[in-house]
């Protein structure tokens, strides 16, 4: 099969828990809804592969030590390309957050934009 599609969804039924130390409700630091979809191509004829991935992460409350606040929902698109030169050498290019949507995944952490990674892999 040259083309394949994959989809996933997760639902978290709770968004807070009773902290036994403070005896107060704390956020669980995770989104209620997450979903993803992947369209993948694996050529039978040529030594190439590729995929386009989409991810959605729902907004949620965050609390950890001195850091607390809201994580805004975000949608990201990723691209992965691979080329097999021979039985011993492969190259992979991954572009995460293709559209450079600046977003925060944890309160107190940096905003994350596009990340590109080129990997050469050898086997022997």
PLM segments and residue spans:
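C-terminal beta-signal and adjacent terminal beta-strands/loops
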Residues: 55-63, 70-72, 79-124
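Short sequence motifs at beta-strands and strand-loop junctions characteristic
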Residues: 27-34, 71-74, 110-112
